[in-house]
Amino acid sequence: MESWLFLLGILAIAIVGKNKSLIIGVSAVMVLKLIPQTQNFLKLLQTQGINWGVTVISAAIMVPIATGEIGFKELLNVIKSPAGWIAIGCGVLVAVLSAKGVGLLAMSPEMTVALVFGTIIGVVFLKGIAAGPVIASGLTYVILTVFNLVPGH
């Protein structure tokens, strides 16, 4: 019962915040939860969902390359600019932080609750997008490391 109230609360916040992605996500999970035969799929979604999402995002990012909108010329031009190097550095940083964050979530699954809550606040009230839980867990890992608070260490 508690899980239903939690999901309904998130759905209500998503509706008030007019966040379509969160509305669809919560609704899909609620429908799956209603069907007893989908419990294994829910576990699979929990363990592999982020990987599936990253795959979809990666494919979307590749479309301009596939359509010819972006080619080697654009890559060379961006490498010549300070903004391009900053973007490359940020990409590297996010990849490393995400890897650390996934490790933190594996060591301390209860951290997921706080990250999800923070993500919901950011999505609904600050008009963010829910692509950040893994990055947020990476930032959390860095901060916890600085203060020597990483669970399991």
Swiss-Prot record:
Listed transmembrane segments: 4-24, 52-72, 85-105, 115-135
Annotated compartments: Cell membrane
GO-annotated cellular components: plasma membrane
Keywords, comma-separated and alphabetical: Cell membrane, Membrane, Transmembrane, Transmembrane helix
Membrane topology qualifier: Multi-pass membrane protein
Family: Belongs to the UPF0756 family.
HAMAP family in the cross-refs: UPF0756 (MF_01874)
Name of the featured protein: UPF0756 membrane protein LSEI_1366
